């Protein structure tokens, strides 16, 4: 058995083509395109790279982006004031605060200051709560991207046992709730779970989101399972030992090229949706 490759890069490219048409139609109708505002506080090179990648994705689909750069010394109040300014700007349809922010800033307060209708990265507590309750809200970009990838490849979720290894507020926790809302039976584990192997051994779907290179071993995973690796570490490895699973899993996300492209794609996807709602 050769595992089906859940190709996030290919799906992201296909989606970008569709989004380009939607943006062009909106521009033809209104003379405007959606605008994503990205906020970068400080000079962290990795964060700057991520912000640039998001801006490039906007450019590829013909959508505008607004880059807001603030100094490392920015205070919580100063960042809150900038977010309020963007909330009140009718030309801005999505707001992304690049994580992490400098330690003197209350990141949670700043995330929660983002207007719900512009929370296209799915980081507010209100958005998380609405998502958990099955109400309309933009999902956290990575888990929402995973759900879109599973849907595109018609991976059945209803009644399946999904084990999510990881509990971060922007990945593990929302991932578990999205799977639950799709009628999967969900077990949440993490790096301190006792006898982790026994939980994973029963899983129809395994999601690695623990942030430790190849923490989840291939021989823990049962034949025919669907394997989703949301990790990425130097050397091109994820959170799961993927090599031996090529002929054991029924489907898997490659690293790189699986989950990663879907994260930025989902941010752009939700930004276009927000723009359509506000401009159409």
From Swiss-Prot:
InterPro entries: Aminoacid_DH-like_N_sf, NAD(P)-bd_dom_sf, THF_DH/CycHdrlase, THF_DH/CycHdrlase_cat_dom, THF_DH/CycHdrlase_CS, THF_DH/CycHdrlase_NAD-bd_dom. It holds the Pfam family THF_DHG_CYH. GO terms for cellular component: cytosol. It comes from the Bacteria. Keywords: Amino-acid biosynthesis, Histidine biosynthesis, Hydrolase, Methionine biosynthesis, Multifunctional enzyme, NADP, One-carbon metabolism, Oxidoreductase, Purine biosynthesis. SUPFAM superfamilies: Aminoacid dehydrogenase-like, N-terminal domain (SSF53223), NAD(P)-binding Rossmann-fold domains (SSF51735). It catalyses: (6R)-5,10-methylene-5,6,7,8-tetrahydrofolate + NADP(+) = (6R)-5,10-methenyltetrahydrofolate + NADPH; (6R)-5,10-methenyltetrahydrofolate + H2O = (6R)-10-formyltetrahydrofolate + H(+). The keyword Ligase does not apply. Gene3D superfamilies: Leucine Dehydrogenase, chain A, domain 1 (3.40.50.10860), NAD(P)-binding Rossmann-like Domain (3.40.50.720). The keyword DNA repair does not apply. One of its GO terms (molecular function) is methenyltetrahydrofolate cyclohydrolase activity. CDD domains: NAD_bind_m-THF_DH_Cyclohyd. GO terms for biological process: L-histidine biosynthetic process; methionine biosynthetic process; purine nucleotide biosynthetic process; tetrahydrofolate interconversion. Its EC number is 1.5.1.5, 3.5.4.9. Catalyzes the oxidation of 5,10-methylenetetrahydrofolate to 5,10-methenyltetrahydrofolate and then the hydrolysis of 5,10-methenyltetrahydrofolate to 10-formyltetrahydrofolate. NCBIfam families: PRK14192.1. Belongs to the tetrahydrofolate dehydrogenase/cyclohydrolase family. This is Bifunctional protein FolD. It comes from Teredinibacter turnerae (strain ATCC 39867 / T7901).
């Amino acid at each position: 058995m050769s595992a089906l490759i859940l190709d996030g890069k290919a799906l992201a490219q296909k989606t970008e083509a569709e989004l380009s048409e939607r943006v062009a139609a909106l521009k033809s109708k209104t003379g405007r395109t959606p605008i994503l505002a990205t906020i970068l506080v400080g000079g962290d090179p990795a964060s700057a790279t991520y912000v640039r990648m998001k801006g490039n994705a906007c450019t590829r689909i013909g959508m505008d982006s607004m880059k807001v750069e603030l100094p490392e010394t920015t205070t919580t109040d100063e960042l809150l004031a900038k977010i309020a300014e963007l909330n009140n700007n009718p030309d801005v349809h999505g707001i992304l605060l690049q994580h992490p922010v400098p330690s003197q800033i209350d990141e949670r307060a700043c995330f929660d200051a983002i207007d719900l209708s512009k929370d296209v990265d799915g980081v507010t507590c209100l958005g998380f709560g609405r998502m958990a309750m099955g109400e309309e809200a933009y999902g956290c970009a990575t888990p929402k991207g995973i759900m879109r990838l599973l849907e595109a490849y018609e991976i059945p979720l209803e009644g399946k046992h999904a084990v999510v290894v990881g509990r971060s507020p922007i990945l593990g926790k929302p991932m578990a709730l999205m799977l639950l809302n799709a009628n999967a039976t969900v077990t949440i584990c993490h790096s301190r779970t006792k006898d982790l192997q026994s939980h994973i051994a029963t899983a129809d779907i395994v999601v690695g989101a623990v942030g430790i290179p190849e923490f989840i071993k291939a021989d823990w995973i049962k034949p025919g399972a669907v394997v989703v690796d949301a990790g990425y570490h130097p050397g091109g490895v994820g959170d799961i030992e993927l090599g031996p699973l090529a002929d054991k899993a029924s489907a898997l996300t490659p690293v790189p090229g699986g989950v990663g492209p879907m994260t930025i794609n989902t941010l752009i996807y939700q930004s276009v949706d927000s723009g359509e709602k506000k401009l159409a």
